[in-house]
Amino acid sequence: IALKGTVSKPLLEALNALEFYNLPPPKSLGLEWVQNEVFSTIEAFDLDVKQILRTVVEHCAIQISTVLNSHHLQNGLITGGGVFNSFLMQRISALYGQEIPPTNSTLIEYKEALIFGFLGVLKLKNDPNCLQSVTGASRNHSSGSIYFPEKHRKRV
């Protein structure tokens, strides 16, 4: 759908101007921040879905390629769900100025399952799974919820 849209320059400029991108690491994008900052920025513009999606893809590609270029990386892996978006990956490659080799889908899915399983184990043990040193949060904490089947109903 994004491929069929056009970039809205005013929306792109507004998204790229969000203060988060000027903060030094460590930092992490949280769902709440996306809902409050990104969605409200998008809603301020009267655009159709194709134009919004095309602009958001460009925004993501700009932000990711900026970080890649700032570190002068010679190689690496891009993982996570966004890697399955071939249009996003094309835009990142174009802005990065290098071809980004595809990552094996099994590796991506395994990594995601392993990480979220580990976060769940930490949650069950009531150990921090969100570290201040990684995310920039004000403190270490245990994030997320675990839901058990009805037979073993218990909410942690």
For the regions a protein language model found, what residue spans apply to each?
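A short, acidic, amphipathic alpha-helical segment used as a generic capping/interface helix at domain edges
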Residues: A61-N69
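Membrane-interface transmembrane-helix boundary segments in multi-pass integral membrane proteins
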Residues: K50, G76, N104-T106
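Conserved ATP-utilizing enzyme core subdomain
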Residues: I1-A61, L73, K125-N126, T135-V156
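Glycine-rich phosphate-binding loops at beta-strand->alpha-helix junctions
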Residues: L73-I92
